[in-house]
Structures are given as C-alpha cells and as structure tokens.
Amino acid sequence: MEDDGYNYYGADNQSECDYADWTPSGALIPAIYILVFLLGTTGNGLVLWTVFWSSREKRRSADIFIASLAVADLTFVVTLPLWATYTYREFDWPFGTFSCKLSSYLIFVNMYASVFCLTGLSFDRYLAIVRPVANARLRLRVSGAVATAVLWVLAALLAVPVMVFRSTDIPENSTKTQCYMDYSMVATSNSEWAWEVGLGVSSTAVGFVVPFIIMLTCYFFIAQTIAGHFRKERIEGLRKRRRLLSIIVVLVVTFALCWMPYHLVKTLYMLGNLLHWPCDFDSFLMNVFPYCTCISYVNSCLNPFLYAFFDPRFRRACTSMLCCDQSGCKGSPHSSSAEKSASYSSGHSQGPGPNMCKGGEPMHEKSIPYSQETLVD
C-alpha cells in the first residue's frame, strides 16, 4: 500500500527525528497475520461454499454482495503470509519487485472492494427494508451483478497507483530490501511528500470516510423503520426487534473499530509533513501504526462471522447443509436441502427447524414483516 504500514523507514518529513530505538514486534505481528490468514481463508471459503451451494432460484440480490465480499476478503488474506514473512524478517523483502507490486496491489484492490461491497450490502438492506416496493427493480439479481462489477472495476482503478509506485530497494546504511512506495519517477525528493499525502488522504476518504457515512445513513433508516414497525407488535416481537437492532449496531461499530485507528493514525502521520509533529508524537504514531494495521486486517476474518454466522438463519443453513451431507437428507443439494440452506437469503422464507436432518418437518415461525428480513437477505 502507499501508506500501509510496510513503508516505515525513510520518510522525508521525519528525517530529523531519531528512530534508532524503534522496532515493531517481530513475532506478534506475523502471528496475527497468520491467524487472520487461517481464519479468513476458512471463514470466507465457507461463506462462498454456502452461497453457491444454495439453489439459484432462491438467491437474492444481497447474495452477490456477500459472495463478492467473501472473494475480496479471501484474496486479501492469501497475501498475508508474504507480509508476515516480511515483518518477521524485520522488513526485509525476499520475494522480488514484481511480487512486491502485485501483492501490494491485491491488498489495495481487495481493501477497496471489501469496503464497497459492505456499502453495497448496506444499501441493498436499505432498499429491502425501508423502500421494498418503490425500489424493487433495483434489487433484481442482474442489477446486483452489474453494481458488483462496477465496484470491482472502481477498486481496481483506485489501486493502480500502488502497482505503479511500489518498488524494492536497499536503503543506505542497510542490508535489507524494502518494499515501499517510490515517487521519484513523478516527483523530486522535496515534493514526494505531496504525493504521499495526496494519495493517502484520498484513499482514506474513498476507502473509509465516504463508505462509512453511507453505511451509517443506511442503517440509521433501517433501524428507524424496524423500530417503528415493532412498536405495533406485541411482546413476542421484542426479542426479534432487539436481535435485529443489535446486529445493525455490531456491524457498524465493528467496521469503525477495525478501520478507524488505521486511517486516523495513517492520516496524522502523513500530515506530519505539513504540521511538523514533535518527534515524540511522531515516534508514537510510527510505533502504533503496525498494530493499527493488524486491527484493520482482522476485519477480513470477522466479516464471515458478522455477516453470516451472526444471523441465526444462516447458522441453521450451515448446520443443515453439513448435517445433510453426513446423514443424507431427502433431495439433491440443489433441491430441498439447498432451498433450506438458502433461507438465510430469503426475507420471507421459513427457517429450517433443528430436527430437519432427523427427518422431521421444519418448524414454521409466525410470519412477521421485517422481523424475517435479515441483513443478508
């Protein structure tokens, strides 16, 4: 990334400060990266398996965003072993210039794609719950596919500067090869900071601030609609009301907690070129930035749990799918069992009961508008 925590050395604006004593954890950070890699590949792989395992007829527009989000996170986490090695070797890149460019590019493409997919999913939930009739045509599967394609193209274009400017080099008085952003092809040594600040601030605006505002707005109106609806319901609806509202809060808060420290510290550090922070504060930013990066990366392995397993219907769908694979339920994977597993993506379908794999009939719940709408409709 142009400002992703792997370019810790050689910043022009901090050259007057002494960082001789600064060393990030050579064991903790790689361990976190590997843990995120393991959880992310498993979780996102399970999400993709479940989505594509369901029957095509039962899929909804949100399934496209869910699958795309899982692909984005999966592609992101598979690059983490490279960065874990880089960090463990005390920022010595052994994989060559091309892999430096490509892995950095993939990280940024999928960071943007992941954020955009979350935003698209939030907007899809807004249409499904707040404006289900007036915007029905916008929620067709073909519209979701087109929107997802546009989001991926936009993410790929926004990440182009990383592919262009990423390079490897051995700094003076060092024997370690760094994978860093090199602006020398377009700027002088005195103006490279302007490129760094410009690209860094723009990536924060496009990759965090604007999407977060959109998500927050969508979930505000969703919560308002759900709360207004359940005021008319009896006591049995309170539990579902509390569950739906808690999911909304968890989604928004988790996204903010994972990404806000990274973007905040990154922006403050880069603004040191203009504001000339004291060396103590600048050293503090440099020390905490690698750990803020780790926290943001953790979001890629949390998404499957938050957007899938946190939803009881999706959890039952996974259980039904695995149980049917082992004991053999009636119907093919793309018929009865698949229709049950797809219930997480249908806002008005009946969820399978806990005894589904034992041959019993599904337990039907009372149909309550909106209470059957999930965040992964």
UniProtKB/Swiss-Prot annotation:
Keyword Transmembrane: yes
Subcellular location: Cell membrane
Region named Disordered: 335-377
Record's bilayer topology term: Multi-pass membrane protein
Site positions per UniProt: Required for APELA and APLN/apelin-13 interaction and signaling: W83, R166
UniProt cross-references to PROSITE patterns, sorted A to Z: G_PROTEIN_RECEP_F1_1, G_PROTEIN_RECEP_F1_2
Extracellular compartment spans: 1-28, 85-97, 163-196, 269-287
Cellular component terms per the entry's GO annotation: plasma membrane
One GO term (biological process): positive regulation of release of sequestered calcium ion into cytosol
Glycosylation sites noted in the Swiss-Prot or TrEMBL record: N13, N173
Keyword terms, alphabetized: Angiogenesis, Cell membrane, Developmental protein, Disulfide bond, G-protein coupled receptor, Gastrulation, Glycoprotein, Membrane, Receptor, Transducer, Transmembrane, Transmembrane helix
A molecular function (GO) term: G protein-coupled receptor activity
Official protein name in the record: Apelin receptor
Gene: Aplnr
